[in-house]
């Protein structure tokens, strides 16, 4: 997008009026645990939470008060929905499973439900698990270890991540992921 063609993109903006405590601690810990499991020797694993958030671009030192605050990206990724919408009023994530055409939906997950954090990170993992639950996994081993990942799993991860990462949360429409009997739609 034209507005992102600078050295500092809008998701790097420091939210000077937001304390770092407005980020969801459980989401951050879950993300860090996944990072540790995937890359146990990564140097970020030794950082405290504040240093970690700075290292991944989720927080930065404000030029105004010289304190650590979430960035726009950090708020979207790790904030609670009720805090996110203060900065992104049209923010909305919606997963709809429509497997029976006679029913409006058979499963639904909305960022605004209040039943979970509503942030991008938690949405990604919750929705990914819903998308892949019906995928057939053929028996395959490599070096004696069972491989449960298929090219379809990889494609779904990539499509969901791209949909969320490349979304314009400053715009007027949220993200809708629809799982239907014969297709998956990202919009």
Q: What are these language model-derived features?
A:
Residues 1-187:
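Active-site helix-to-loop segments that bind/position phosphate- or nucleotide-bearing substrates
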């Amino acid at each position: 997008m034209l507005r992102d063609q600078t050295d500092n993109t809008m998701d790097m903006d420091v939210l000077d009026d937001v304390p770092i405590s407005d980020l969801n601690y459980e989401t951050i810990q879950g993300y860090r645990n996944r990072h540790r499991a995937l890359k146990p020797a990564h140097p970020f694993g030794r950082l405290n939470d504040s240093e970690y958030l700075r290292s991944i671009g989720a927080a930065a030192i404000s030029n105004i008060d010289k304190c650590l605050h979430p960035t726009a990206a950090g708020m979207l990724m790790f904030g609670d929905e009720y805090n996110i919408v203060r900065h992104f009023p049209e923010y909305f994530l919606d997963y709809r499973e429509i497997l029976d055409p006679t029913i409006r939906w058979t499963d639904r997950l909305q960022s605004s439900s209040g039943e979970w954090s509503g942030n991008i990170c938690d949405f990604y993992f919750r929705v990914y698990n819903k998308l892949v639950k019906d995928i057939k996994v053929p028996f395959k081993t490599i070096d004696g270890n069972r491989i449960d990942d298929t090219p379809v799993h990889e494609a779904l991860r990539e499509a969901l991540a791209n949909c969320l990462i490349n979304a314009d949360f400053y715009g007027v429409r949220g993200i809708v992921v629809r799982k239907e009997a014969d297709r998956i739609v990202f919009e």
